Amino acid sequence: MSEDAVKNAILIAGPTASGKSALAIRMAKATGGFIVNTDSMQVYGVLDLLTARPSRADLAEAEHFLYGHVPPSSTYSTGKWFEDVEALLGRCELQGRVPIFVGGTGLYFRALLGGLSQMPEVSAQVRDHWRGRMEAEGAKALHAVLCVRDPAIAAALQPSDSQRIVRALEVLESTGKSLLEWQKVKGRALVDDQSAQKIVLRPDRAWLGERIARRFSAMWAEGAIDEVRALLALDLDPALPAMKAIGVREVSAFLAETMSREEAIERSVIATRQYAKRQSTWFRNQLGEDWRVYASGEEVFQGGSFRDPQ
């Protein structure tokens, strides 16, 4: 553990719609801390509603950082997020205050506590080669190439995961080593594992499913259609992460009059529930036993479970 890792941080993980943001605000008020986005989709601009970013009222209640600061035309990696967090934690005006990391991206939490893998530089020539092939041949074809050249990492990737497939091929060609080998070489952690309060929300599945349905209906009523219309006006590459946000494809189909309002909402709700299930499974299998599990944010404050790190 790095000596300059931040001590007494609060980490709040959990599936989408589980109440993480409300809990983070309550903790920020209790500690005088500040909230740091730990969700890979909430970094992108334009999609305030569809990515469930904090509302204006939320922002007025506590300081929030790293939300909506990336244009949807960009690709934002775990490494870039790590760099942004490192810079944020070094700001003088935030020294001595409790950082509260909240979100649903497990790899971000892993990087915070365990350090980031030291990734090699890839030449522009190699990068252009593989990205050109991806555009020409598609993810499935390049996944087949990866199966032959690096079967171990190919087995860990979905055949549709174009971004990670290209990255694995780039690294293999540039270094002669599998991306899996590079991922074993860790840098310094940003947060001290021992002193951090680590919380994971695991609400009742039926309750979460209903909450997801209500929330998406509210998103639709509050302007999700306008968000997607604004995103489509940018004429972005469909392969960009922001274009893959849940709800974008469904609302786009509604705008193109190829899907009814009811079907667009229903499909978005189903996709969100499936995503929440994948998140819950990841947190259950990947987080250590020192993460405390709660059914709700309210439960965290009951019975003296929460301790003010100040």
From Swiss-Prot:
Similarity remark: Belongs to the IPP transferase family.
Name this polypeptide is given: tRNA dimethylallyltransferase
Complexes and interactors: Monomer.
Cofactor(s) required for function per UniProt: Mg(2+)
Taxon lineage: Bacteria, Pseudomonadati, Pseudomonadota, Alphaproteobacteria, Hyphomicrobiales
Gene3D superfamilies, A to Z: 1.10.20.140, P-loop containing nucleotide triphosphate hydrolases
GO molecular function, one term: tRNA dimethylallyltransferase activity
Keywords: ATP-binding, Magnesium, Nucleotide-binding, Transferase, tRNA processing
Entry-linked NCBIfam families: miaA
Site (Interaction with substrate tRNA): 105, 127
Annotated stretches, region: Interaction with substrate tRNA: 39-42, 163-167
GO biological process, one term: tRNA modification
Amino-acid positions noted as binding ATP in the UniProt annotation, renumbered to this chain: 14-21
Species for this entry: Brucella canis (strain ATCC 23365 / NCTC 10854 / RM-666)
UniProt function note: Catalyzes the transfer of a dimethylallyl group onto the adenine at position 37 in tRNAs that read codons beginning with uridine, leading to the formation of N6-(dimethylallyl)adenosine (i(6)A).
Entry-linked PANTHER family: TRNA DIMETHYLALLYLTRANSFERASE (PTHR11088:SF60)
